[in-house]
Structures are given as C-alpha cells and as structure tokens.
C-alpha cells in the first residue's frame, strides 16, 4: 500500500489513529491486480468459478454493495447498544456546537442506523429479484477498532460513511442495468448526506471538495476485510479478488 498522504477528496482528513490508518491505507497508489471471475465458487454451495475470467455481473456488484451495507448496519446496531443517548449528547467533541446539534445527535445516529438497515433489505430484495443469492453478514471486530470510546465510535462512523460514498462512486460504472443504476444512486446520495453530517460533528468540512473521489471495488473490499472483518460465512477474500480493480470498465 502506498504511504502517500490522503487528501480530503479521498475521504476525510485523518485525525485519530484508527481513522488515519484506515484512510492512509485507502490511498490510491497501490499496484493494480487483475479483476475477473464471478461470485460462483465464493458463496457456500455455489458452482465452481469459471476458469476464464469474466467481468462481475450486476448481482456480484450488488453483493459488493451489500457487503458494505451489512458492515455499516451492524456497526450502528452494535454501537448504539454500547453508547447511550447521554454518551453521545455529552461527548466532548460536541461542546463547541449549539444545543440543537447536541440534543439531536443520538436521534440522528438512530436514523442513520435505520437507513443502513433499509439499504440492506433493499439490496437483498434486488439480488433475489435477479435470481441471485445475497451474501450474509460477517463477524466484525468493532469492539477493538471503534467502540473504545464514544469519540472513536463517531470518528469511525465518519470513515465508514465517507468510504461508502467512494465505494458507490467507484462501482456505478460497473453496473449494466439502468434500473439498478438508479437504485444505487439513491443509496449513494443518502450515504453522502450521512458523511456530510459526520464530517461536521467531527470538526471537518461537511463538503470538502467539488467532486468526490471514487475508489475501485476491489480496493474497498480488501480494505474493510483487513480493518474490520474477523470472519465471513463465505469466501470474502476470493470475492474481493473477483471485483474490478478500476473505477471504469476495461
């Protein structure tokens, strides 16, 4: 991985060990790998993967998005079981804000959680509608990476949401069906709203650049696997290798 500094356009400014490390590793300078294959052979009981590499299908790309949404939804569900309303409204990083922002923060986190759960449900329905098999959720290590303090929880939330925007931006060109493009875009814009709010309460610019920076699906997949995932009921590493390593189709 490149150790070059990460710009605002690649996510958010690093200001915390976990966030800094995560975004630094998300730099766009690593060597490219060859993409190809399909989800066959990755899910339990699936057919053996084709020996000739093929571009990922729309179902594969939806399962990629679902992998990220499972992670985000679980993050908020578990995090809001660890941290109470008082933990969030009384957090030190909110002292510079007015009473309205402080009093609303817990309810807004609940709303973000509900959005992510709805994204999971919608993606699962879309995948089944295409006769595909939705990937299940994995086991995550949020206790060590995000739940050490309320400040760390909110900081990692910012990282995840900004990364989600880069992920959708990087995946959209690999979707073929027009109706799926619309579905993906409507999720991506909500992720961007989450990211803007979390940038603000973390003391960063809510909308730092005129253009967001897309990130290749394989890079995102490998990044979240390395940083947050303990194990999965499917072969996540193999799935990551099947995803595109560029933001534009070859």
Residue ranges and their predicted role:
Residues 2-18, 27-31, 39-250:
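All-alpha RGS (Regulator of G-protein Signaling) helical domain and cognate RGS-like helical scaffolds
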């Amino acid at each position: 991985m490149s150790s070059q500094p990460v710009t605002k356009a690649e996510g958010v400014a690093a200001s915390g060990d976990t966030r800094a490390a995560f975004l630094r590793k998300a730099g766009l300078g690593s060597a490219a790998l060859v993409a190809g294959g399909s989800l066959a052979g990755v899910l339990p009981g699936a057919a053996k993967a084709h020996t000739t590499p093929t571009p990922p299908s729309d179902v594969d790309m939806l399962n990629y998005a679902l992998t990220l949404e499972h992670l985000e939804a679980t993050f908020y569900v578990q995090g809001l079981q660890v941290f109470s309303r008082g933990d969030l409204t009384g957090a030190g990083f909110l002292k510079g804000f007015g009473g309205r922002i402080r009093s609303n923060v817990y309810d807004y986190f609940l709303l973000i959680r509900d959005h992510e759960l709805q994204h999971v449900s919608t993606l699962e329905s879309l995948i089944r509608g295409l006769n595909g098999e939705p990937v299940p959720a994995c086991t995550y290590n949020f206790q060590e990476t995000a739940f050490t303090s309320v400040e760390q929880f909110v900081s990692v939330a910012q990282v995840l949401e900004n990364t989600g925007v880069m992920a959708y931006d990087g995946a959209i060109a690999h979707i073929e069906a027009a109706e799926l493009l619309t579905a993906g875009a409507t999720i991506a814009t909500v992720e961007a709203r989450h990211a803007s709010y979390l940038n603000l309460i973390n003391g960063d610019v809510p909308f730092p650049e005129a253009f967001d920076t897309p990130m290749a699906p394989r890079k995102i997949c490998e990044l979240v696997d390395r940083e947050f995932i303990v194990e999965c009921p499917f072969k996540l590493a193999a799935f990551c290798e099947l995803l595109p390593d560029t933001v534009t189709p070859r």
